[in-house]
């Protein structure tokens, strides 16, 4: 019988993960099934128990359950412990192993797919929520020159910077406090693009040759990327590649095989803009 995997979320009907993992399974000749499962907002633990009871081997976790998955895990990877959130679970008897592949997915998309080295770069990370926390350690591992966190409420950005101060001296402050500085990479980890909102970014933050990266994606250009282009970003990229790369990393955690991502990403992109 095929090994069973799934993604938990609420909502979840929009998820591209089943199609991505089905493509990975075919490509790597792995015998598995992967489905989307809706968990009640107050019933994530029960949904996990029911899935394990029917033979579930592992699961991805998306909004709004990543922090709850972190608390539910009996063992954590270093990157999940750092992130304070879990997006990948492995079920092995009574043990629940929690991992976080978001940061690895982001870094691999930027460095491999986009060919943009992070070594020695000045990085601005917009947002101080869970999406930002999950990617800071993997970004710092690439040895950038600096990493500054900016947020609407400066105190949250400062607190997040302090949480990773043992890894590198990070900066934290408000969006307005980035005025007069320029960056090689600006990453939008806020949810502003979901609501169609634009961020109050001061002009001049995009250095020559800079990359603007939005973790969100959609049929058209996100408001952040439109603003970035207007303000002089040399290159713009959305988060579809990050989605595929974090899925590939989760597939590797489960199966020990790293699938290729180029064709899967190209097919998803074609469907998105069709």
Curated annotation (Swiss-Prot):
InterPro entries the UniProt entry points to: Aminoacid_DH-like_N_sf, NAD(P)-bd_dom_sf, SDH_C, Shikimate_DH, Shikimate_DH-bd_N, Shikimate_DH_fam, Shikm_DH/Glu-tRNA_Rdtase
Where along this sequence does the record place binding of shikimate?
A: 15-17, 62, 87, 102, 217
Gene Ontology MF: a single term: NADP binding
Class of the enzyme per the UniProt entry, highest EC level = oxidoreductase
Q: Which residues form the active site?
A: 66
Its catalytic activity? Answer: shikimate + NADP(+) = 3-dehydroshikimate + NADPH + H(+)
Q: What metabolic or biological pathway is this protein involved in?
A: Metabolic intermediate biosynthesis; chorismate biosynthesis; chorismate from D-erythrose 4-phosphate and phosphoenolpyruvate: step 4/7
Tell me the residue numbers annotated for binding NADP(+): 78, 127-131, 215, 239
GO terms for cellular component: cytosol
Task: Name the UniProt key words of this record, in alphabetical order.
Answer: Amino-acid biosynthesis, Aromatic amino acid biosynthesis, NADP, Oxidoreductase
Question: What's the Enzyme Commission number for this chain?
Answer: 1.1.1.25
Alphabetically, which GO biological process terms does the record hold?
A: amino acid biosynthetic process; aromatic amino acid family biosynthetic process; chorismate biosynthetic process; shikimate metabolic process
Name the family the entry cites. Answer: Belongs to the shikimate dehydrogenase family.
Q: What does this protein do?
A: Involved in the biosynthesis of the chorismate, which leads to the biosynthesis of aromatic amino acids. Catalyzes the reversible NADPH linked reduction of 3-dehydroshikimate (DHSA) to yield shikimate (SA).
Q: How does it assemble?
A: Homodimer.
Q: What is this protein called?
A: Shikimate dehydrogenase (NADP(+))
Q: State the species of origin.
A: Dechloromonas aromatica (strain RCB)
């Amino acid at each position: 019988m095929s090994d069973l995997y799934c993604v938990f979320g609420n909502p979840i009907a929009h998820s591209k993960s089943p199609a991505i993992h089905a493509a990975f399974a075919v490509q790597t000749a792995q015998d598995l099934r992967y489905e989307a499962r809706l968990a009640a907002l107050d019933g994530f633990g029960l949904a996990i128990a029911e899935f394990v009871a029917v033979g579930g081997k592992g699961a991805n976790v998306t909004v709004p359950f990543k922090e709850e998955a972190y608390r539910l895990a009996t063992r954590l990877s270093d990157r999940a412990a750092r992130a304070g959130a879990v997006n990948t679970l492995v079920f092995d008897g009574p043990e629940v192993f929690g991992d976080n592949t978001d940061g690895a997915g982001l870094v691999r998309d930027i460095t491999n797919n986009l060919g943009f080295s992070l070594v020695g770069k000045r990085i601005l990370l917009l947002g101080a929520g869970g999406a930002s926390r999950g990617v800071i350690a993997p970004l710092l591992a690439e040895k950038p020159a600096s990493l500054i966190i900016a947020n609407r409420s400066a105190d949250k950005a400062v607190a997040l910077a302090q949480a990773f101060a043992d890894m590198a001296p990070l900066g934290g402050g408000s969006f307005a406090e980035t005025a007069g500085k320029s960056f090689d990479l600006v990453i939008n980890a806020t949810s502003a693009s979901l609501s169609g909102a634009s961020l109050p970014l001061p002009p001049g933050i995009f250095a020559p040759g800079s990359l603007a990266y939005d973790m969100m994606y959609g049929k058209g250009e996100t408001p952040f990327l439109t603003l970035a282009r207007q303000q002089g970003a040399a290159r713009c990229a959305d988060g579809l590649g990050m989605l595929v790369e974090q899925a590939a990393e989760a597939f590797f955690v489960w199966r020990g095989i790293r699938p290729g991502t180029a064709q899967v990403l190209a097919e998803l992109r074609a469907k998105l803009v069709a």
